[in-house]
Amino acid sequence: MKRTYQPSTVRRKRTHGFRARMKTKAGRAVINARRAKGRARLAV
């Protein structure tokens, strides 16, 4: 059986990257929440 997680840097950046987050209102909320919490890494 093939595993579900087949890592791809491109897909990872496109779906969870900083620019992808900034595109939507909800994504910006995620970034702001992580900033408020003091996360060292805001996005992938």
Swiss-Prot record:
The keyword Ribosomal protein is annotated on this UniProt entry: yes
Protein keywords: Ribonucleoprotein, Ribosomal protein
GO process annotations (BP): translation
GO molecular function annotations of the record: structural constituent of ribosome
Lyase listed as a keyword: no
Gene3D superfamilies associated with the record: 1.10.287.3980
InterPro entries listed in its UniProt record: Ribosomal_bL34, Ribosomal_bL34_CS
Gene Ontology CC, one term: ribosome
Family: Belongs to the bacterial ribosomal protein bL34 family.
Name this polypeptide is given: Large ribosomal subunit protein bL34
